[in-house]
Amino acid sequence: MLPPKHCNINLTGPIPRWDEAIPLGNGILGSLFWGPMEHLRISVDIAGLWLRRRPEEKLDKEFTYAKLVELARKGDVAETRRIFDTPYARPTPTKIPAGHLFLDGLPRGSYQASLDLGTAVTSFSQKGTTILRAFLCMGRPVGVLMLPEAYRGATLTVERPSFGNGTQATEAGNSVSPGSLQQLALPDAIPETEDGMIGFSQKGDDRTAYTLLCKKCGTTLYYTAVQAENVEKASRLAKLELCAAEDMGAEKLLQQHKRWWQQYWGKSSLQLPDETLEQLWYRANYFLAAGSEPGNAPMPLQGGWCADDDRLPPWKGDYHNDLNTQFTYCHYLTANHPEQGKVFLDYLWSLRPQAAKFARAFYGTAGECLPSVMDIDGGALGGWPMYSLSPTNQIWLCQMFYEYYRLTGDKEFLRTRVEPYFTATAACLEELLQEGPDGKLVLPVSSSPEIHDDEAASWLTPNSNYDLALLHYLFHTLVQIEYQLGNPRGYWHAIESKLAPLSVDTETGLMLSPDETLQETHRHFSHAMAIEPLCMLRYENPQDRSVIDATVDHLVHLGSGQWVGFSFGWMALLQIARSNGNGALYELHRFAEHFLSRNGFHLNGDYKNSGVCDFHYRPFTLEADFLAAHAVQKMLLRSEKNHIEVLPACPQGWKNEPVAFQNLRAENGLLISYQRTADSKHSLTVKATQDGSWYLCNTHCWVTLQAGQTQSYQWTEEEKK
């Protein structure tokens, strides 16, 4: 089922900013359409296009965990910043834009720009007349612009980004806005003109080069961007792509493109009595496919779209593993798009040699651990070390592997991917843990992202609830994995038994650490990991219920002053954990109203100055879009310990409204379709993709199915009573 029309992106132009642009993407290329119609700008990004080079001085020789522990215990903030945070201020490594095109010769004046999510085709029109249609071919690094005959004379030009040559004076940047592209000393671009093609090839560093080309064929214009190890290869491949596109023709490319998207949208759908939540969900699913294509680089902070404002992207467009990557890839499984999300898991798996190298070089341990702020090769970028170099963030990456198994039921993946990844991570963490005076295991230093920023107070008394929840999750899940693979040993259980329980205050719930409670509003609910996303505490357990209620109530009491965009989706999840659909709906509406650009991009701060938080900047990051979609799904479907419940957090206002969804994925690959009519008739269909048994909470029965089998149920409210 295609997305409803109200989920399309409809804008009135001229569009003044790149972060409000019409976003096209295919997981290989990303393009942003913006500016005045007569000089339409098309920003072009290539997935995985990075300048990888590191400064000659590289990382300080004291860039080690042992040194970090020493400085933390001394309270030496200045030296900690010098060694561990300063590297992030260097301009490279960084994600970079590929360039932009300018389409000239179209009429002046205001216009209507529309992106049809169902087909991923954008159209620009004036007074009801379509002037331009454009799409990025799924499966090919090719964009197509289609003009009516009246605008055959329109022209396309290509410009490279405003990279510097290393001689210009540039302003100092910061982590949010790292400064001008002029900081990047790159050689001049090589012009490309051959067989009607125009563009350029750009050498980046010893491992990076790319070519951006376009060609006009009557009323159709094609463009491509290809990266390779060297300029010669990039140029050759780009020319081959354009020739192949021209040979196939725009209409055939469009037919293939539309078929791909029709199949994609057929994987899952939903119909809600709330257009805002529908829009959040469908747009997030569009952004997922537009930014994450099997065989290509996974989405960094900005997904498939790099900044096009002559500056480095916010936070360098890097991979933040202390929340951002995990939230970016949190909703895809329930949405039944495992292929798009597995891109990130394949990427993490490919980085295992780097993770082992970093564990040895930085932590001085066996096993594997990636830095929490890293470049595309898994190299440490630096940053606040309490979080950018926290070893427990690696466990959150482990959870992503287990979630893939949990929601697909793929036992081979469990054996060949999940178990080795968990075991290698545990080998690193086990060496870092030390036995305290009470016999409990603690880390040498502990923190809770991003509490107390990078001040001395950010080092909490070990173990913080953030670290502790993740450690419990790691060793407890390893026990489960061994049982699931038929090889229980008891080793991991013995380690978990030496971890202290979570620190709890009767008034405020989960604490930051054994001796500190959260006293002020804060964006990162890291102390509440045990509730969401680790789901270790269960609301049906009376003891857990009191902890969950106290924790969430305390966060509400402290207010949203220091929240950012992702905080609202996270709070929605915390409300869902206690079946508070009204609370979840409230937070998701606040997020949608105050933190989204008009094209659906999450801009992180209250950029409209509405008063919902104290941050009024607008750096674009995409993880909060996916987190909001995840919350929408959790309102509709709960799947834990093979117990399936539909509408576990239904808002009061939906009680007499139609609600439906199709093929949302539950545990062990069970696909759930559900419908409730306005007169409260319910229908539920479950389809197994793996053999298994599940308990259906709404019908109070177990169902046992073989792969491919389905079972349907109908009931009314009276029958339910």
What kind of feature is each model-predicted range?
Residues 2-380, 441, 483-559, 593, ...:
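Aromatic-residue-lined binding/catalytic grooves and analogous aromatic/hydrophobic interfacial grooves
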Residues 57-58, 66, 314-318, 386-387, ...:
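Aromatic/His-enriched, Gly/Pro-containing loop or helix-boundary segments
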Residues 675-676, 686:
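CBM-like carbohydrate-recognition segments
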Residues 22, 279, 319-326, 336, ...:
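Aromatic- and histidine-enriched alpha-helix N-cap/loop-to-helix transition segments
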